[in-house]
Amino acid sequence: MATVQQLVGRWRLVESKGFDEYMKEVGVGMALRKVGAMAKPDCIITSDGKNLSIKTESTLKTTQFSCKLGEKFEETTADGRKTQTVCNFTDGALVQHQEWDGKESTITRKLEDGKLVVVCVMNNVTCTRVYEKVE
């Protein structure tokens, strides 16, 4: 089973399925969805043992949040939503749960065959994005 430290590093997006549908379900407008679909971001995960930081970096936009596992915090998402978010590490996966305006979404990051697999779920819409480690 993976540990938080095994998720640490720079990861590059290599495959994406269902991202437009997920963004639509979250409430992202068409213009931002088109831009989001074109982006091939790097995901940079760092941890000092207590705090976790996730930075999503592309030529179009860079977003970052830091948190302590198990503690709720306010996150500003790439599309500008303000969410109440909590991250936990459960069964070898980093689970990020967001709530805003009576809605909720869960983003799970886990290792599969040496790749970072990110699964985003809202209602019955699921998006899977696969990243390969670059450093």
Swiss-Prot record:
Intracellular carrier for long-chain fatty acids and related active lipids, such as endocannabinoids, that regulate the metabolism and actions of the ligands they bind. In addition to the cytosolic transport, selectively delivers specific fatty acids from the cytosol to the nucleus, wherein they activate nuclear receptors. Delivers retinoic acid to the nuclear receptor peroxisome proliferator-activated receptor delta; which promotes proliferation and survival. May also serve as a synaptic carrier of endocannabinoid at central synapses and thus controls retrograde endocannabinoid signaling. Most abundant in lens and retina (found in the mueller cells), moderately abundant in heart and testis (found in the Sertoli cells), and present in very low amounts in lung. InterPro entries: Calycin, Fatty_acid-bd, ILBP, Lipocln_cytosolic_FA-bd_dom. GO terms for biological process: fatty acid transport; glucose homeostasis; glucose metabolic process; lipid transport across blood-brain barrier; negative regulation of D-glucose transmembrane transport; phosphatidylcholine biosynthetic process; positive regulation of cold-induced thermogenesis; positive regulation of peroxisome proliferator activated receptor signaling pathway. N-eicosanoyl ethanolamine binds at residues 43, 109, 131. Hexadecanoate binds at residue 131. The modification Phosphotyrosine is found at residues 22, 131. (9Z,12Z)-octadecadienoate binds at residues 129-131. It is found in: Cytoplasm; Nucleus; Synapse; Postsynaptic density. The modification N6-acetyllysine is found at residue 17. Its main location: cytoplasm. This is Fatty acid-binding protein 5. GO terms for cellular component: cytoplasm; cytosol; extracellular space; glutamatergic synapse; nucleus; postsynaptic cytosol; postsynaptic density; postsynaptic density, intracellular component. One of its GO terms (molecular function) is long-chain fatty acid transmembrane transporter activity. The keyword Transmembrane helix does not apply. Monomer.
